[in-house]
A protein has these predicted regions:
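C-terminal and late-domain segments of enzyme folds
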Residues: 86-170
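Generic detector of bulky aromatic hydrophobic side chains
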Residues: 42, 51, 67, 87, ...
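N-terminal beta-loop-helix "entrance" segment that forms/cooperates
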Residues: 81-85
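Helix-loop-strand module that forms the ligand-binding subsite of alpha/beta enzymes
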Residues: 1-66, 148
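Alpha-helical membrane-embedding segments
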Residues: 18, 57, 75, 96-98
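Short beta-strand elements in bilobed, periplasmic/extracellular small-molecule ligand-binding domains
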Residues: 65-74
Length: 170
């Protein structure tokens, strides 16, 4: 599990965190965090905390993180008020329950779509990098409609096969 936190500057995450995301951007097309759980905390004395948290949540989504919980907090005083304390306690309890459950969630249709587009493009060699082709050359990844060991129902498995067939050149 990870906790990602950022104060809000100019209605967005910090430049340092953005640089980290840019540095790790290969995870958008070589996902590997299928079993990870992430808590995102954004803070501000003004506005933009929800938007910044949602941006980070979207990044984690494309990296195929199993579970993401956001905790955007706006406070205008030196001390946290009771409302913010209640939010923090509620979200912390929810995240703790998720961690203790050890549950692996079924991926969304969007995750299955992106997984199979990248899988097909890499197997085809469609202008993707050498590292992408090497990642997707793993036999287990080549043969599955989503990462091995992740639960996926019949409808989503069929959807994954369809998407792969549309993008894969035989």
């Amino acid at each position: 599990a990870s906790i990602i936190t950022s104060p809000v500057y100019s209605m967005q995450i910090t430049g340092l965190l953005k640089n980290f995301i840019d540095h790790m951007s290969y995870n958008f097309h070589r996902p590997r965090f299928f079993y990870k759980k992430v808590l995102i905390i954004t803070t501000t004395a003004g506005a933009g905390h929800k938007e910044a948290a949602n941006y980070l949540k979207e990044v984690m989504y494309y990296w195929d993180v199993d579970y993401v919980l956001t905790m955007p907090i706006a406070y205008r005083d030196i001390q946290l008020n009771d409302k913010n304390r209640a939010i923090i306690n509620r979200k912390a309890d929810k995240f703790a329950l998720e961690l203790n459950s050890r549950k692996v969630h079924e991926p969304s249709f969007k995750s299955i779509l992106m997984y199979n587009v990248w899988r097909a493009m890499s197997i085809n060699g469609n202008g993707v990098g050498i590292a992408d082709c090497k990642y997707w050359s793993n036999e287990k990844l080549k043969e599955t409609n989503f990462y091995p060991g992740i639960p996926i129902g019949f409808v989503k498995r069929t959807f994954g096969k369809f998407i792969f067939s549309r993008f894969h050149k035989k």
